[in-house]
């Protein structure tokens, strides 16, 4: 009976007829979250949060634990899949004006911040060379905060340098944050269904709706199958494709890597941080690169919701997408010309997208006499 009720609930959930594949990434994110929780639990069972044993415990998981290599690779590559899906999900929201559903957008941006924090803490756990130095660089940014900076950094580290207490608390945070993500995801979905999904046209969907099941369930299953095939192909044939070679060496505080860089999904934020020569300015720009998403629902001036019928805004959006990729590319390069100049121009263009959004909306209204 409960099974029938669940099916009936999905059957009665009305969805716009014309929503495209770009609306499938929400369910894919839910699948990624489930995968991360399951693999993460099995990894946590065998992991040791100690600076002398952490690196060895990862080697032990991959070599000695039955299917440990698969768990470790699924967890690491699953994180990359998670970020691919969330960036596409956000891009869809930007393009089709989904951010006008304010509560859903604000809860989603908070989810992104929590996800980035969780991924950062997780990257430190293997205690490889890049893990250690990435943690050193990013946590050191707290010292840029006037008056409180040094105290906050010491408090976060649990001492006067990154050491055993730092790793222990990072493991605790990496374990607890996903439960917050689950709670907020539930709220995100609840808030979404208060109003219902938007559609590519940006019009009111009430006039033409179909049941979620079987139409959208099959559509979701297709995309989930494609994602699973991609994930298992990478895990089986290219497990180290996203790994940094430096992270195969145990952390050594006495040797600095030639080029410190985070995982690929943080490169855009790291590129913006590096493009500003001032420490406090860089730290503020880093935070603002994410927080600026919160401004979108309040700066939308166009009478049209979606960018589908806004050619100027489409051009701006695709320029923004290219800018995102350029910043990510420059963040992998050393801090020297011409990369410094390119990253500074790209960082400026990144923020210009959000500034130009209300201006373009106003301009389009004038041209179309809306």
UniProtKB/Swiss-Prot annotation:
SUPFAM superfamilies tied to this protein: a domain/subunit of cytochrome bc1 complex (Ubiquinol-cytochrome c reductase), Transmembrane di-heme cytochromes
Membrane protein topology class: Multi-pass membrane protein
InterPro entries: Cyt_b/b6_C, Cyt_b/b6_C_sf, Cyt_b/b6_N, Cytb/b6-like_sf, Cytochrome_b, Cytochrome_b_C_euk/bac, Cytochrome_b_N_euk/bac, Di-haem_cyt_TM
Note describing how the cofactor binds: Binds 2 heme b groups non-covalently.
Cofactor section: heme b
Record: residues binding heme b b562: 75, 174
Binding site for a ubiquinone: 193
GO terms under biological process: mitochondrial electron transport, ubiquinol to cytochrome c
Positions of heme b b566 binding: 89, 188
Gene Ontology MF term list: metal ion binding; ubiquinol-cytochrome-c reductase activity
Cellular localisation: Mitochondrion inner membrane
Further facts: Heme 1 (or BL or b562) is low-potential and absorbs at about 562 nm, and heme 2 (or BH or b566) is high-potential and absorbs at about 566 nm.
Family statement: Belongs to the cytochrome b family.
Known role: Component of the ubiquinol-cytochrome c reductase complex (complex III or cytochrome b-c1 complex) that is part of the mitochondrial respiratory chain. The b-c1 complex mediates electron transfer from ubiquinol to cytochrome c. Contributes to the generation of a proton gradient across the mitochondrial membrane that is then used for ATP synthesis.
Assembly mode: The cytochrome bc1 complex contains 3 respiratory subunits (MT-CYB, CYC1 and UQCRFS1), 2 core proteins (UQCRC1 and UQCRC2) and probably 6 low-molecular weight proteins.
Record's protein name: Cytochrome b
Gene: MT-CYB
């Amino acid at each position: 009976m409960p099974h029938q009720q669940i099916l009936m609930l999905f059957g009665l959930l009305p969805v716009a007829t014309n929503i495209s594949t770009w609306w499938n990434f929400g369910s894919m994110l839910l699948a990624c979250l489930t995968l991360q929780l399951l693999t993460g639990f099995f990894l946590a069972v065998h992991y040791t949060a100690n600076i002398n044993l952490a690196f060895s415990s990862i080697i032990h998981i991959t070599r000695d634990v039955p299917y440990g290599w698969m768990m470790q690779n699924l967890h690491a590559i699953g994180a990359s899949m998670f970020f691919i899906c969330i960036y596409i999900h956000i891009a869809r929201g930007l393009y089709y004006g989904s951010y006008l559903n304010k509560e859903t957008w604000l809860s989603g941006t908070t989810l992104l911040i929590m996800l980035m924090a969780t991924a950062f803490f997780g990257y430190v756990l293997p205690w490889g060379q890049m893990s250690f130095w990435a943690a050193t660089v990013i946590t050191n940014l707290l010292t840029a905060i006037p008056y409180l900076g040094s105290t906050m950094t010491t408090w976060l580290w649990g001492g006067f340098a990154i050491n055993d207490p730092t790793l222990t608390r990072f493991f605790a945070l990496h374990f607890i944050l996903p439960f917050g993500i689950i709670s907020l995801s539930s709220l995100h979905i609840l808030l979404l269904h208060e109003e219902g999904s938007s559609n590519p046209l940006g019009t009111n969907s009430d006039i033409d709706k179909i049941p979620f099941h079987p139409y959208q369930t099959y559509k979701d299953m297709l995309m989930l199958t494609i994602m699973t095939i991609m994930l298992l192909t990478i895990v089986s044939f290219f497990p180290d494709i996203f790994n940094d070679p430096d992270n195969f060496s145990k952390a050594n505080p006495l040797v600095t890597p030639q080029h410190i860089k985070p995982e690929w999904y943080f490169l855009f934020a790291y590129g913006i941080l590096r493009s500003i020569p001032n420490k406090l300015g860089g730290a503020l720009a880093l935070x603002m690169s994410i927080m600026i998403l919160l401004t979108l629902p309040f700066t939308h001036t166009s009478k049209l919701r979606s960018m589908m019928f806004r050619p100027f805004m489409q051009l701006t959006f695709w320029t923004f997408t290219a800018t995102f990729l350029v910043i990510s590319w420059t963040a992998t390069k050393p801090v020297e010309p011409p990369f410094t100049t390119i990253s500074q121009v790209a960082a400026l263009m990144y923020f210009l997208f959000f500034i130009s959004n209300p201006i373009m909306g106003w301009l389009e209204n004038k041209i179309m006499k809306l």
